[in-house]
A protein has these predicted regions:
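Non-heme di-metal
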Residues: 2-293
């Protein structure tokens, strides 16, 4: 593994914080099977993470000492470990994004635009829903729980889909994405448990979380697609081959990472849903053993 790993569990949570230190210096420009399309698809995702992960952390921190959950010692430990993992994800994606920048890909600009989109989404949602009693804290947690469900689901696909794994031809990058995927599934229930602990499980909370998933997925699709096209155009790689590679990787019925997410994404709309109903325990155990995590 091209990373120095330090594993700690000071919080005593059900999962540890792994302090990674990947070296991206020798990552090739088109690190994913030599394909500009595939590489820029994943780089566009990576550009979302620094601002996105910080939003998740801020959303959970804002309510962690709410009277309804502040005495819940188990959940408080999970929150601390969640924050630690998300902070490490931010650090490593910032490192990779900077390495992509050296090839002339303006990922820094995409990181800035991600934050602009998040803040605009927050303000728009507040304008629409505060008059009916939805607080900013609830809006932020709605978005966080929805996006955490997406990240955990796409992460599990990355760990399941052999076709996708075969395309991850650079060891440093594949290890980074597999590590990130493992941790997204380890902490997939934390923001959800915070949301339910603070805002309950009634009809209002159910409608809020379902509506937020629809809005978040629509926004995410538009933003990530724009980022991909921008990266391809800047790189003079906006061509049929790149778009075909992206289609097969992301959206083909039999192999696509996005199309493979359908059942798990729809499960979010079930009354009584909980992220842990989507069992990935054995999957994670196998991958942690494989990577020495």
């Amino acid at each position: 593994m091209n990373a120095k790993v330090k594993i700690t569990n000071r919080a005593g949570a059900s999962f540890p914080v792994r302090r990674m230190n990947f070296n991206f210096e020798n990552v090739p420009e088109y690190w994913m099977n030599g394909s500009a399309g595939l590489t820029h698809f994943m780089t566009a995702l990576s550009a979302l993470f620094p601002a996105g992960e910080q939003f998740f952390i801020d959303s959970v921190r804002a309510v962690r000492y709410h009277p309804a959950i502040k005495e819940n010692e188990v959940l408080q430990k999970e929150i601390s470990a969640f924050i630690g993992q998300e902070a490490m994800h931010t650090q490593e994606h910032v490192g990779f994004n900077a390495s992509a920048q050296k090839y002339g890909h303006d990922v820094a600009r995409l990181e800035q635009q991600t934050d602009i989109v998040i803040q605009g989404f927050r303000k728009t949602a507040a304008m629409l829903f505060k008059p009916v009693g939805v607080t900013q804290e609830m809006i932020d947690l709605m978005g966080t729980t929805a996006l955490e469900h997406f990240t955990a689901t796409i992460a599990s696909q990355l760990l399941i889909n052999r076709h996708i794994q075969e395309l991850m031809t650079d060891e440093t990058m594949s290890t980074m994405w597999y590590w990130h995927a493992i941790e997204e599934n380890e902490h997939k229930a934390v923001a959800y448990d915070v949301f339910e602990g603070v805002f309950g499980t009634g009809v209002k909370a159910y409608l809020a979380r379902c509506g937020s998933l629809i809005a978040a997925m629509a926004t995410l699709f538009v933003v990530q697609s724009y980022f991909v096209l921008r990266l391809l155009k800047q790189d003079n790689q906006l061509n049929l081959k790149a778009l075909k590679d992206i289609y097969v990787y992301g959206y083909s019925p039999s192999k696509g990472i996005i199309t493979g997410m359908g059942r798990e994404m729809l499960a979010y709309f079930k009354p009584g849903f909980h992220p842990n109903h989507l069992d990935t325990v054995s999957l994670l155990a196998n991958w942690k053993a494989k990577l020495g995590l």
